[in-house]
Amino acid sequence: MPIELIQVKRLEPGRVRAGFSQSPPRLHHAAYVVARERIAEARDELERRGLPAFLHATMGDLDSTLHDGAPVMGHHLELHADSRALHDFFAMVRNASAGWDGNDPLRSPGA
């Protein structure tokens, strides 16, 4: 399971800043990959259930949304539209973890 460490420098606009303002040590979010043809439906369903999106990011083939689930679940939900780029990214992360013994906590991909 990939674990993501976040060090925030600056967040804008306010709804994104609020979404990242949970006090540590808390789980920030759990992420799910959703079939591209069902991603809009999944996002709409979270909105209907009272988990509004506070960040929608796209870059090339990557398409992700963070939903505010903290009041209901204690953490946010991140939805990723399934794509080759997403699988390639997590393959890079998995490959970077090979042989990691914890002595160097921050490593560059390909290191």
Can you name each region flagged by the protein language model?
Residues 1-52, 68-111:
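Glyoxalase I/VOC metalloenzyme domain signal
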